[in-house]
């Protein structure tokens, strides 16, 4: 094991063969995820989902996979909801599914755990933040964690909340999207306006969901661009690099007499 990687792994208690497992791996004893620390509205949405046919089906799939020893990330699927209570959501940044490597996913879209190398998409996000707002890219072992955004009311939501190791989008059709669609609709329907940042074709499919849910014509801000991935960040029709979303969000917040986000 390379120097600096030891903190990303932990010995699985009770394993006779002393398997070493990533710290961010979802364990069978962690399922179903704990609900402590979640706001009342998040609890209502989650409980309604897990009682539904889609939720029951997803629960069975997760239990079956964990029972076979399938490596699944992250250990904390609800972390975005825990860090950003429903009534504090000011901005929603929509991702697709968690990073699928050991130590990476930490339950926040685009964010990576302590000591992890910053992925290319997140590197482009920081690059655009600096270009748009002048904020310097973070440094140090926690540089890739976006927890500081989440604590300011930025909900970093993936449309699927788990993924199998080394298998991108492996849980994208398991039913998570029913839950996350309900979360998006609940935010669009509440009285407090929200800025929705939709990067890439997958995220932009949710624009109509937001508009349909927003029957009261609340003054939400919906911003679209290409995905920050190097494959699309500089391409038309709306390159991510140069989109100016971070500055526009702060202008919108200031106009609504709210504090800007410290990106």
Residue ranges and their predicted role:
Residues 22, 26, 36-210, 214-216, ...:
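A polyanion-binding, active-site-adjacent surface
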Residues 9-12, 27-33:
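Short, Lys/Arg-rich amphipathic segments at extreme N-termini
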